[in-house]
Amino acid sequence: MASPLNNGRKASEIFQGQALLYKHLLGFIDSKCLKWMVELDIPDIIHSHSHGQPITFSELVSILQVPPTKTRQVQSLMRYLAHNGFFEIVRIHDNIEAYALTAASELLVKSSELSLAPMVEYFLEPNCQGAWNQLKRWVHEEDLTVFGVSLGTPFWDFINKDPAYNKSFNEAMACDSQMLNLAFRDCNWVFEGLESIVDVGGGTGITAKIICEAFPKLKCMVLERPNVVENLSGSNNLTFVGGDMFKCIPKADAVLLKLVLHNWNDNDCMKILENCKEAISGESKTGKVVVIDTVINENKDERQVTELKLLMDVHMACIINGKERKEEDWKKLFMEAGFQSYKISPFTGYLSLIEIYP
């Protein structure tokens, strides 16, 4: 008869394992809580309350018009979100509890320039969420991605055929690009000496516009899928071009790849990088490729950052057959694509800036 204590473990260890198991079993509630507060505009309500002052629970449920029969449940949701760092519980008038925004929930204020609310709406969209229910089936199917198994078509084909999903995706990528405005303030050196740059896969041009505003003399071109840029207009130093990065990338002093390469497997990345090398090979002496992407480093990163990067790797691998990479993976790609050297610099909390030289 097997021992009730697995492999001789202490009862305390087993109960710790149970707690970890249950935490992850209920982990899906985390993202649903985010969706709930974004759909109800709770960050916006707190942001606009008395010029951003904390809001009491009674004031919040009154604005939300929550029935008395559901106030306890709503309070549980708010308490859980506060515990996870999305709200701060403070004491105001006569020691009454109130909710204030944190750095995380400020990013979900829809009226904010740095709002990531569209990212929440995109990731928790039914097609994206539903695909994960097909993991078991995916293992034994020929299709490389759970997205393909779930919807019967590759991600990029689906996004081109579904206007609503395409719009949600582009809005999510655009709001993520706005965050770069903060990072680029400390990275002006990246663009010094350049006269032209191509933002490959640059979406609706948010990143390119940020660069153009910071460097008015720098000519910037956005290369994107034709259906994304067909109705977009440029400016004096910004142009939009519909094309295919797997076929040809316009000539420039530099090529920018922001969160592009993690979408693709190594063979596809090789094709993109080879085209980048061709694009920057000319008379310019400053030719380089600028990659903004994830570099996994489990030995140096904080646990929370590592967990995010590994989760992103799972997401990219299963949804579109993409990949988050360690430095040795990046080096192998760069060298095999014909580049001679590279330099990795910190960029944001989880992203790195990599300069690659031919």
From Swiss-Prot:
Its EC number is 2.1.1.231. This is Flavonoid 4'-O-methyltransferase. It holds the Pfam family Dimerisation. It catalyses: a 4'-hydroxyflavanone + S-adenosyl-L-methionine = a 4'-methoxyflavanone + S-adenosyl-L-homocysteine + H(+). Keywords: Methyltransferase, S-adenosyl-L-methionine, Transferase. The keyword Nucleotidyltransferase does not apply. The keyword Transferase applies. Residues 155-173 are annotated as: Substrate binding.
